Amino acid sequence: MGFMAAVALVLGIGYVVVVFIVEPLRLRRRTGASGWVASLGATTAEKTASAMFLLGCGLELSNPALVLAGFALPRVDFPVAVAVAGAGLSVASVVLAAVSQHHMGQSWRTSIDPDNAAPLVTTGPFQVVRNPTYTSLLANSLAIGLLVPTPAALAAFLVCLWALQLQTRRVEEPHLRRVHGEDYQRYARQVGRFLPTIGRVSGFGR
């Protein structure tokens, strides 16, 4: 369990470094903007989603860290093959996030920027799901749980899922509808939110 916890912690930290540091720096070199946006005027929904997301990430990374520190957390004993699959899923999630951020270019931002409307991106991974970066976040959270299967891992995944659902449904999708109108609505009818075909919308406000 200690080895798997070490692998999980390295992969979890690696995901954060690649997605939130390396890729934004590469974006800054290409476009002059890193995508980091201060959400000073964030709504209550956005603030809540951000807080819950940070909580989920904290649970996700503290789970293997506590195991490495010697805490005897309740856990499920999965076959080694499940842990190997988790490691592979984590690596794949990093690749998906990096590819998604590359396709977004200047449209990738850490928060809604009401003063600078970004183009609607529907190419690459966005042809399959509307939020591939969020899909990668959830996949990485699931991967960490497969490597270190404890109640904390399940809680981390559920909190992250709740946070991303709130962020997309209450913050980002209404913004995209206001900015892109029928173009976004047509796109949302055809492409799923986090998984292919799942989360497609048939009308405004859903």
PLM feature spans:
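Membrane-anchoring alpha-helices and their flanking helix-loop junctions
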Residues: M1-D115, P119-T122, N140-R206
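Membrane-interface loop-to-helix entry segments
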Residues: T122-L138
